[in-house]
A protein has these predicted regions:
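Glycine/serine-rich loop-strand microenvironments at binding/catalytic pocket rims
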Residues: 1-16, 20, 135-139
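N-terminal Rossmann-like FAD-binding beta1-loop-alpha1 element of flavoenzymes
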Residues: 13-43
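Conserved Rossmann-like nucleotide-cofactor binding loop
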Residues: 21, 50, 193
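Active-site catalytic pocket residues across diverse enzymes, especially alpha/beta-hydrolases
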Residues: 29-33, 200, 204, 360
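Predominantly flavin-linked oxidoreductase catalytic cores and closely associated redox partners
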Residues: 36, 121, 125-126, 130-293, ...
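N-terminal FAD cofactor-binding segment of flavoenzymes
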Residues: 39, 47-96
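FAD-binding beta-loop-beta segment adjacent to the flavin cofactor pocket
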Residues: 305-336
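Active-site-proximal substrate-binding core of FAD-dependent oxidoreductases
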Residues: 332-338, 354-394
């Protein structure tokens, strides 16, 4: 049967992924362009049915990047989340015993003064609202299937996936072809498992001077707990049991707003015992008194898991390629010494935006180049990753 032809649409910038890095990039481009009297068309592609649909994360975040992007977010009434009130760090010795580390023994990078316990999905929804008010076009429900190259090998956009394809790979009754989203610059902010970013890193050998990337898996649940067991603003981290010798990782327990608690376990994916089940280790963890005293009598309301890019600066690839750049977890900007990555992801997107604005309308635009790498290496985000570069390897 005859199949419809693919259509195309052109923008100045296309951003793949409506996560913290991609949305921060979109907002920064439009804000700075307006200040400079420029008109820049920006499109954000999001595979989820809505922004935040594929983001399951309760996190403790620093507001440094948010403060730079929207200095008046507090005055504007954005309820970011629960301010951190207290830090606790434990070493779990076995299934029933634990030792709390004194505050002076906890690395400064894990102190959470002035930080917030937030829903990253809610943060992204708010950023998306700001982006749309600034004129960004956000297309939810569109998956970027591959990049598009021009005749010179420069990335010139992305192709969205076809819909209505049968199991045999042939068009079915409801077949709808994808679209070619063409752009002068393409920002990849897909997250840790971004397949387009992985392909770009390989094609342009962006990781040729970097260490192999390190990965972990994080299990997370959100619980509604009794009011008597809820301590708003309490942040608990720990390591040890149930992880055995040779297994890296740790747990977290965050007391958020509305009697909700975020609990999870992160396990490095280099464990030697092939019979280990990370999911079952997480279930064991919840029976430890340190965790159980909070969850007892509560109700689990949602759960999930995600991969984590945790190699840090030593495993960070080059961030620029002809026609585009990598931001956030697509590159690996998580600061593992802080167990935080939202602020550095947002900053990487904001720097990418600044680099693109500098390049548009110049000879660099024709070549698809920017000074993103240089700008990133001059930023506080890079300095933060540099300062913690030996935390994981040590």
């Amino acid at each position: 049967m005859d199949t419809p032809e693919r259509e195309s649409i052109e923008f100045d910038v296309v951003i793949v992924g409506a996560g913290p890095s991609g949305l921060a990039a979109a907002c920064q481009i439009k804000k700075q362009a307006a200040e400079q009297g420029k008109e820049v068309n920006v499109c954000v592609l999001e595979k989820g049915a809505e922004v935040g649909a594929h983001i399951f994360s309760g996190a403790v975040i620093e507001t440094k990047a948010l403060d730079e992007l929207f200095p008046t977010w507090k005055e504007d009434g954005f309820a970011l989340g629960q301010p951190v009130a207290k830090d606790e760090v434990y070493l779990l010795r076995d299934e029933s015993r634990a030792t709390e580390l004194p505050h002076w023994a906890v690395p400064p990078s894990m102190h959470n003064d002035n930080n917030y316990i937030v829903s990253v999905a809610n943060l992204c929804r708010w950023l998306a609202e700001q982006a749309e008010e600034l004129g960004v076009e956000i297309f939810p429900g569109f998956t970027a299937a591959d990049v598009i190259f021009d005749d010179n090998g420069k990335v010139c956009g992305v192709a969205t996936g076809d819909m209505g394809v049968g199991a045999d790979g042939e068009p079915g009754p409801g077949y709808t072809p994808g679209m070619d989203i063409l752009a002068k610059y393409t920002i990849l902010g897909e997250g840790c498992r971004g397949h387009i970013g992985k392909g770009i890193i390989k094609k342009f050998a962006l990781d040729s001077d970097a260490d192999p990337q390190h990965y972990g898996i994080g299990f997370k649940e959100i619980w509604q707990v009794p009011e008597s067991q809820h301590k708003p603003g309490l942040v608990v981290h720990g390591s040890g049991w149930p992880l055995s010798k040779g297994m890296g990782g740790g747990f977290f327990l965050y007391h958020a707003e509305n009697q909700q608690v975020f609990v999870g376990l992160i396990i490095d994916l280099n464990y030697a015992n092939p019979h280990i089940s990370p999911f079952d280790e997480f279930q064991r963890l919840k029976h430890h008194p340190i965790i159980a005293e909070t969850l007892s009598g509560g109700e689990r309301i949602t759960y999930g898991a995600r991969a984590i890019t945790k190699g840090g600066l030593n495993a960070l690839p080059k961030l620029s390629f002809p026609g585009g750049m990598l931001v956030g977890c697509d590159a690996g900007t998580l600061n593992f010494s802080k167990i935080k990555g939202v602020h550095t992801a947002m900053k990487s997107g904001m720097i990418a935006a600044d680099a693109i604005l500098e390049a548009l309308g110049t000879d660099a635009e024709e070549k698809g180049t920017t000074n993103f790498q240089q700008l990133f290496e001059q930023s506080w985000a890079y300095q933060e990753l540099y300062n913690s570069r030996n935390f994981g390897p040590a």
